[in-house]
């Protein structure tokens, strides 16, 4: 393991020192860092050698479970990536962006033992974003229950969404991308390009906004999304937030509210990858504006709202992973939910796939290229 310590000096400069212990690894993070304006921090390399890590979950015994998109779940224990892997993992549609995606433990895991997974499930017509829950005995899953699959399945290898969060009131929210077909996001007759809400057992809450409406899917909470690859529920304010991976420009941070339309592809701050326009408008009545957006795109993936006293300078801020621009992005939002400041952290760290907060309140980052897990240490 390598440790990097960053000291903030007079608001202008910082010094970097490096030390190695017996777990030193030449693949550990050693790139340049943009120091935060509000919080001094260090970085520990927790594990290297991962292949396309996507999600992270923390068990009460200290183990960290990390999903690899190809369909495996790795175990980090006592600062080491174990050779042993979790058994009885479901088969996945491991094409392009599809595969084994998010993993979260139930807030009451100590009593009920549930672990929730999202993955691209193979099936007729291609693959579809699927949610399941299971229990862990030793290093094997047992008592596996598939809860939901987004319909229709699509012969596409992009835009699965797939983040899962709990609201602490008996519900789960999770994201589903529009699978590369823009029009899906505006159609209430499918689950694609949506944020969805279920009871924890997979049934549909009776107070979902489109329950009882003909031709509308009852699981839908909000719509008009492109590819929400970050999702967080802030229990302190009882608000749901997502980050959406935009096209060429137009990544978004959104406050996600019941029944609302987030505009894709009718309004966007992005353009097609070939430079042609998607639309000529960025606002329309009845469609929500992002709280923050990025032009050019940073390729957002992974989202956490810092709720821990471990990082007093960042408390209440959002940390967002950047795939294309390979950093962690910090966004400050006012009490009125307006973006007031942002900055780049951990520059050139690698393609950031996940940013999560552990039960102890520490922040962890998973990257691909190289595949590793890092811990942000407050100073």
Question: Where are the regions that the model predicts?
Answer:
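C-terminal motif of bacterial Sec signal peptides marking the signal peptidase cleavage site
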Residues: 15-18
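Short, conserved, GDST-rich strand-edge loop motifs in beta-rich repeat architectures
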Residues: 174-192, 250-252, 256
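Sec-dependent N-terminal signal peptides
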Residues: 4-12
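Positively charged n-region of N-terminal signal peptides that target proteins for export
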Residues: 1-4, 378
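Surface-exposed loop and turn segments in beta-propeller and other repeat-based domains
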Residues: 85-98, 144-160, 200-222, 264-295
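Conserved blade-ending motifs and adjacent loop-strand segments that build the rim/top face
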Residues: 225, 337-359
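Beta-propeller blade signature
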Residues: 129-139, 188-201, 256-257
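Acidic, Gly/Ser/Thr-rich repeat motifs that build Ca2+-stabilized beta-propeller blades
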Residues: 23-181, 233, 239-246, 296-334, ...
